[in-house]
């Protein structure tokens, strides 16, 4: 039996990963992390979606220690979430240092326990917010270290790594879940479900990608299929 664990926030990217994983694996588990995030409404959304989509199990892990250690606008109410700035340089204040290191490591431990062969994460280097822990190089290096440390080959899969946001919408549509992803996920840094606040970087990337996809579905769908190998 093929098993996988999806790092699941209830947002656009991880929900699309879950939808695909359910088609590719016999048994899919979800793991969601409570780190005291500003947008922690995503945890309830993740619970609802994991149940609705048919995950075998859904674990919510308490990692609120991360909130104490990592200073970010997502972990401190005193630091405002910035509006999207298209020309902004450097790492944005929404970056939570160490978050994906911790999440992927804990997800791998869970995968070890449930005998899953893969941990799936929705990180993306093509169309992202400048986070260093979303890079392909980082994921591969951590995957190697975790596999060595566990003496077990648990594969980190990144199905969205080389597709952009428009193509991510196309992927959701390919599996017949475009409306679900649009209306029932929570991507917004300010914790607003669906189309979100419309001002933060997460909402901007999501909206621009959706508009691009809806404006030229055949071209974007073809590009997504070419990059992912889907027929």
Curated annotation (Swiss-Prot):
Catalytic activity: 7-carboxy-7-deazaguanine + NH4(+) + ATP = 7-cyano-7-deazaguanine + ADP + phosphate + H2O + H(+)
Leading EC class: ligase
Protein name as it appears in the record: 7-cyano-7-deazaguanine synthase
Protein EC: 6.3.4.20
Bound cofactor: record note: Binds 1 zinc ion per subunit.
Record GO biological process: queuosine biosynthetic process
UniProt-recorded Gene Ontology molecular function terms: ATP binding; ligase activity, forming carbon-nitrogen bonds; zinc ion binding
Lineage of the organism: Bacteria, Pseudomonadati, Pseudomonadota, Gammaproteobacteria, Enterobacterales
Cofactor(s), by name: Zn(2+)
Protein family per UniProt: Belongs to the QueC family.
């Amino acid at each position: 039996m093929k098993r996988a664990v999806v790092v699941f926030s209830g947002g656009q990217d991880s929900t699309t990963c879950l939808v695909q994983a359910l088609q590719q694996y016999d048994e899919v588990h979800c793991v969601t992390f409570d780190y005291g995030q500003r947008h922690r409404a995503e945890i309830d959304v993740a619970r609802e979606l994991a149940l609705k989509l048919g995950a075998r199990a859904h674990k919510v892990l308490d990692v609120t220690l991360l909130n104490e250690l990592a200073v970010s606008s997502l972990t401190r109410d005193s630091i405002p979430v910035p509006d999207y700035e298209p020309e902004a340089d450097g790492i944005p204040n929404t970056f939570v240092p160490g978050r994906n290191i911790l999440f992927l490591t804990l997800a791998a431990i869970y995968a070890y326990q449930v005998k899953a062969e893969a941990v799936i994460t929705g990180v993306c280097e093509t169309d992202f917010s400048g986070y260093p822990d979303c890079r392909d190089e980082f994921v591969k290096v951590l995957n190697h270290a975790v596999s060595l440390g566990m003496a077990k080959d648990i594969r980190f899969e990144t199905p969205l790594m080389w597709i952009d946001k428009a193509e991510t919408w196309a992927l959701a549509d390919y599996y017949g879940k475009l409306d679900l992803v649009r209306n029932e996920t929570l991507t917004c840094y300010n914790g607003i479900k669906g189309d979100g606040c419309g001002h933060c970087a997460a909402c901007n990337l999501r909206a621009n990608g959706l508009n691009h996809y809806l404006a030229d579905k055949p071209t974007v769908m073809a590009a997504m299929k070419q990059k992912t190998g889907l027929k």
